[in-house]
Amino acid sequence: MINNPSLLGTSIPVTKNVGSITQIIGPVLDIVFSPGKMPNIYNSLIVRGQNSAGQEINVTCEVQQLLGNNEVRAVATSATDGLMREMEVLDTGAPSSVPVGEATLGRIFNVLGEAVDNLGPVDAGLTSPIHRAAPSFIQLDTKLSIFETGIKVVDLLVPYRRGGKIGLFGGAGVGKTVLIMELINNIAKAHGGVSVFGGVGERTREGNDLYMEMKESKVINEQNIAESKVALVYGQMNEPPGARMRVGSTALTMAEYFRDVNKQDVLLFIDNIFRFVQAGSEVSALLGRMPSAVGYQPTLGTEMGTLQERITSTKEGSITSIQAVYVPADDLTDPAPATTFAHLDATTVLSRGLAAKGIYPAVDPLDSTSTMLQPWIVGEEHYETAQGVKQTLQRYKELQDIIAIPGLDELSEEDRLTVARARRIERFLSQPFFVAEVFTGSPGKYVSLRETIKGFQMILAGELDNLPEQAFYLVGNIDEVAAKAVVSQSGD
């Protein structure tokens, strides 16, 4: 794999290779070329012409199959309305290329790398092909290191791996978007990194809401677009399956430039990885492949692996990926989520119960998991503190039924103490976010891992049993708890 992306765009060869459409079936086109002039698999083809109403047509498609008799089968990445047989098709001679570099920050792109935010064209100067090989073995960074987020519940209980892949599970309204925006903000401030957001097959309204919220929270700076911390790439659910299948690759290509050339740590968000699989399933059926288990494409494992293996740490930098995972009918054995799980290093589950209590971020400390939470990776102190927190919360959960009916008085002295500490831990796991300042009025807090461990050790040891529960709610480090308790007592 070449470290530096190509500095050339999708340039059209001097000798034009032109074919013509022989068949159109929805988003799938069959195109015939002259003998010996067949385009390669994944080459980008452009259909230009006029429809019957005299309107200009410009449709880009990607070669998927070579059929024989000088014919290829291609999948369109935009609507095929108005296309007719015998229209001319131009072979660009290369896969699609998209803009990369700092010029992409603060902008919204489609799958072809075209800006769709009405702020004019992107003057990137650099482009890179969306189909690239994963880094070779010798380029990989094999050292296991924690990616510190500054979010207490994540760093302590479900630490993220630098260059790892994290699954984000949660229904509507439990705080996925705010958590994503806080991570984007923190990687920029604490790590000097940038983020790329790939909206794969989700609702257009959600993409617009995210963009507006990012502008409001200054993750995207309207006044000075160059100071923005994120590039957005959208292929929404109203677009053809060819676009939805490739938008993840477009976002990843932009992220790879920041990793390989700028040598930065990058956060790549994919929302939703299930829609990537779904689009691949549609394309597979349209291409006439025999379906596999539950109707999915037979190439499911290969397609997922090709995308996921490009997301990794190299000796230059890292791409840490957070992927929202939709689980169809809550069936974790469905081939789409099951294939995704094989690639994940951690799972972050957002709980509606915690959100209802007003505890944000609403990360479920018992359901969320991480392969990094091992004593030989995070150290004995971190591991033992995390296990102590989990055991206390688990015991509190077991006692809920007794508390609900006979009440706290029926518990033993030891259990009452456990409940009191668990309630303090639960509140201390909440945290004010920088991106939520405009809504809450509370200044955001970045808490280092060292301070996080110290705070929870003090709660578990009983050093703070005398402080009121409310003092632990929506604060940063443990010193703020004592200060808040003093303020509340003086107010009383």
Curated annotation (Swiss-Prot):
Principal localisation: plastid
Keyword line: ATP synthesis, ATP-binding, CF(1), Hydrogen ion transport, Ion transport, Membrane, Nucleotide-binding, Plastid, Translocase, Transport
Cellular component, GO annotation: chloroplast thylakoid membrane; mitochondrion; proton-transporting ATP synthase complex
Residues reported to bind ATP: 170-177
Transmembrane feature ranges: none
GO biological process: proton motive force-driven mitochondrial ATP synthesis
Membrane topology: Peripheral membrane protein
Coiled coil: none
Class of enzymatic activity (EC top level): translocase
Subcellular location: Plastid membrane
Record EC number: 7.1.2.2
One Pfam family of this chain: ATP-synt_ab
Catalytic activity: ATP + H2O + 4 H(+)(in) = ADP + phosphate + 5 H(+)(out)
Purpose of the protein: Produces ATP from ADP in the presence of a proton gradient across the membrane. The catalytic sites are hosted primarily by the beta subunits.
Quaternary structure note: F-type ATPases have 2 components, CF(1) - the catalytic core - and CF(0) - the membrane proton channel. CF(1) has five subunits: alpha(3), beta(3), gamma(1), delta(1), epsilon(1). CF(0) has four main subunits: a(1), b(1), b'(1) and c(9-12).
HAMAP family given in the database record: ATP_synth_beta_bact
Similarity comment text for this entry: Belongs to the ATPase alpha/beta chains family.
Family matches, as PANTHER family: ATP SYNTHASE (PTHR15184), ATP SYNTHASE SUBUNIT BETA, MITOCHONDRIAL (PTHR15184:SF71)
Protein name as annotated: ATP synthase subunit beta, plastid
Organism field: Aneura mirabilis
Lineage: Eukaryota, Viridiplantae, Streptophyta, Embryophyta, Marchantiophyta
Gene field: atpB
